[in-house]
């Protein structure tokens, strides 16, 4: 019984860490083990460090979480743990 509850707990924690959404204005991007990052209000990610590598997923650096500037700017952040979010305008630099 103890083993089952441990497996169940581990399974549910893995599932929750893989289903984090990253939404950008009108479009929504979902990536496994990616940090959520919302563009619009200037806030970026969650926890200290903004879009840090909290779940072992994507980690971006240098204008991460998409582009900075006008509506025609589409930025891609690439980090050591995979590809970061994709943004269209707004300011979301972590």
UniProtKB/Swiss-Prot annotation:
Coiled coil regions in record: none
Positions of region (Disordered): 58-94
GO biological process annotation, one example: sorocarp development
Comp. bias intervals (Gly residues): 58-70, 80-94
Disulfide bridge map: none
Family the entry assigns: Belongs to the hssA/B family.
Name this polypeptide is given: HssA/B-like protein 53
Species of origin: Dictyostelium discoideum (Social amoeba)
């Amino acid at each position: 019984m103890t083993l089952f509850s441990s497996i169940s707990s581990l399974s549910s924690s893995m599932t929750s860490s893989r289903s984090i959404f990253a939404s950008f204005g009108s479009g929504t991007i979902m990536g496994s083990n990616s940090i959520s990052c919302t563009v619009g209000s200037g806030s970026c990610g969650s926890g200290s460090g903004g879009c840090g590598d909290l779940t072992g997923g994507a980690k971006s650096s240098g204008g991460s979480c998409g582009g900075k500037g006008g509506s025609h700017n589409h930025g891609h952040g690439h980090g050591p743990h995979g590809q970061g979010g994709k943004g269209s305008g707004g300011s979301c630099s972590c």
